[in-house]
């Protein structure tokens, strides 16, 4: 355990994850228990120098005890069936390798190196092809190589084909019987041997290559650099149309395709002869990327259909019509329908007995008149969902009480209308009995311009009006009925001790004007009497 503790990361799980991402290393999780195989791993495998060297170069190791909270959380994301369990997680969070049970030190070191190299080759190839495809203005012609669909959670084939000594595992986590391809090597005679192995355990994601020596790290890195420099030339060659003068390429492509299909179905070992032209995983990636573009076209067509549905919906207008009693009518009309159709719908569906009315928009307030009935809803700017209110038309009302006296005076003497209005304004400053309307129609003296201060001539006219207003044709009842108009005129004179039982111009009724001067109240009813 002392050797294992020296290899593990000193820190929390989040810190270990950030460390692995920052240094581009594999995040390796070792879950152990109290069983015999876990103890054997601790004594024999983790103490080996090759394992320690591989971990220091390629991995960040975290040790978790089985049954702990961290082990439960890990199993929820990356399920495992037994302990001890060793799992390698890539940069993007995908599980690239896992083994359960005892494993030798040589196999563990080789598997970790191959997983790290395959992950880096995949990342380098993907970045180069992404840059190459982004620079293309036109769509790249699709080669005759068929696209190979990889199961979820597996390593792409470019990690196995691009590197001669790289082993890749292809196995879905859900199937009972899976096939893993391992130890894909290129012999001197140009033969590609693809060895398939059928595993009885669904959790075994790695086929250890015991017979194959572990490749050197320096040689593999040089191979990666060579593949990176060779990639732009391949991209340019793939842009050119395929000519029938290279039958070896087509034969090789069909052979690889048939071998992959047969390997999945039967799990048998197939040895095929290569004509000297190898098909790398980059061809498969290119085909997959082009297929992705083609699969996106139906989505665009679906988007156009959705736009057509939206435009179809925009051609309908949903109206919510509010009636005066608080009820509502809801109906859908076309934008080409005229407003008269809406009004006919209201007439046929209302039950409150509406009279003459108009339709209006509540905000901003706009009332549609009879001239708008022949206009379409689109011309009236009614789209989508709109609210309308029913506005009843107001009936004209005649108030006879307020107009009977003045109209009779105007009809009696049409020339006295302006004079009466002017005198009435002047009397509002000095006369508390300004409700006498046209009582000055028989006055013959002309009135000068408006005066802001009362004068003796106006006061004399007041006395004459008070004594001469006895014409039975105009009626005394109208004089008494117009008493409330005094407050409506707004005079600034306050009367004192007014009694309606007395004569309107009786003696002893004193009043004040706006200049604190008291008039009236004398024995003879003289309005010129000042106090």
Swiss-Prot record:
Compositional bias annotation for Polar residues: 174-190, 201-214, 441-478, 486-496
InterPro entries: Thioredoxin-like_sf, Ubiquitin-like_domsf, UBX_dom
Record PTM N-acetylmethionine, positions in chain: 1
Gene expressing this chain: PUX11
Protein name: Plant UBX domain-containing protein 11
Source superkingdom: Eukaryota
Subunit comment: Interacts with CDC48A.
Region listing for Disordered, in residue ranges: 160-316, 441-531
Biased composition (Basic and acidic residues): 290-301
Leader peptide range in chain numbering: none
Feature: compositional bias, Low complexity: 160-173
């Amino acid at each position: 355990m002392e050797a294992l503790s020296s290899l593990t990361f000193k820190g929390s799980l989040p810190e270990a994850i950030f460390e692995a991402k920052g240094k581009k290393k594999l995040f390796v999780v070792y879950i152990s228990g109290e069983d015999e195989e876990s103890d054997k791993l601790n004594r024999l495998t983790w103490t080996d120098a090759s394992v320690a060297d591989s971990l220091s170069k390629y991995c960040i190791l975290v040790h978790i005890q089985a049954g702990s909270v961290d082990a439960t959380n890990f199993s929820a994301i990356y399920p495992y069936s037994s302990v001890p369990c060793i799992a390698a997680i890539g940069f993007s969070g995908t599980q690239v390798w896992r083994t359960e049970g005892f494993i030798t030190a040589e196999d563990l070191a080789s598997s970790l190196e191959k997983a790290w190299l395959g992950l880096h080759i995949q990342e380098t190839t993907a970045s180069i092809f992404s840059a190459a495809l982004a620079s293309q203005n036109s769509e790249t012609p699709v080669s005759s190589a068929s696209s190979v669909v990889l199961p979820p959670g597996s390593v792409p084939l470019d990690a196995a084909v691009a590197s001669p000594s790289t082993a890749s595992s292809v196995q879905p986590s859900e199937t009972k019987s899976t096939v893993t391809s391992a130890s894909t090597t290129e012999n001197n005679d140009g033969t590609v041997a693809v060895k398939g192995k059928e595993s009885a355990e669904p959790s075994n994601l790695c086929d250890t290559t015991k017979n194959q020596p572990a490749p050197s790290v320096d040689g593999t890195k040089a191979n990666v650099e060579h593949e990176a420099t060779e990639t732009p030339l391949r991209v340019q060659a793939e842009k050119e149309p395929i000519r029938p003068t290279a039958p070896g390429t087509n034969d090789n492509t069909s052979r690889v395709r048939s071998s992959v299909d047969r390997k999945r179905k039967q799990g048998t070992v197939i040895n095929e002869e290569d004509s000297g032209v190898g098909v790398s995983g980059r061809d498969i990636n290119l085909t997959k990327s082009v297929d992705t573009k083609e699969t996106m076209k139906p989505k665009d067509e679906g988007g156009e259909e959705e736009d057509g549905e939206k435009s179809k919906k925009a051609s309908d207008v949903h109206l919510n019509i509010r009636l005066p009693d608080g009820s509502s009518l809801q109906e859908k009309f076309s934008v080409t329908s005229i407003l008269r159709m809406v009004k006919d719908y209201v007439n046929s569906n209302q039950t409150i007995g509406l009279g003459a009315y108009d339709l209006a928009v509540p905000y901003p307030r706009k009332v549609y008149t009879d001239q708008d009935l022949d206009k379409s809803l689109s011309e009236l700017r009614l789209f989508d969902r709109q609210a309308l209110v029913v506005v009843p038309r107001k009936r004209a009302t005649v108030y006879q009480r307020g107009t009977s006296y003045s109209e009779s005076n105007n009809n009696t003497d049409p020339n006295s209308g302006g004079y009466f209005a002017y005198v009435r304004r002047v009397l509002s400053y000095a006369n508390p009995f300004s409700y006498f309307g046209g009582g000055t129609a028989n006055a013959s003296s002309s009135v000068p311009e408006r005066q802001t201060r009362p004068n003796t001539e106006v006061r004399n006219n007041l006395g004459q009006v008070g004594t001469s207003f006895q014409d039975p044709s105009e009626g005394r009842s109208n004089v008494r009925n117009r008493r409330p108009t005094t407050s409506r005129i707004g005079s600034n004179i306050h009367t004192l001790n007014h009694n309606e039982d007395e004569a309107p111009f009786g003696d002893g009724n004193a009043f004040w004007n706006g200049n604190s001067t008291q008039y009236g109240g004398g024995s003879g009813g003289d309005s010129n009497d000042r106090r």
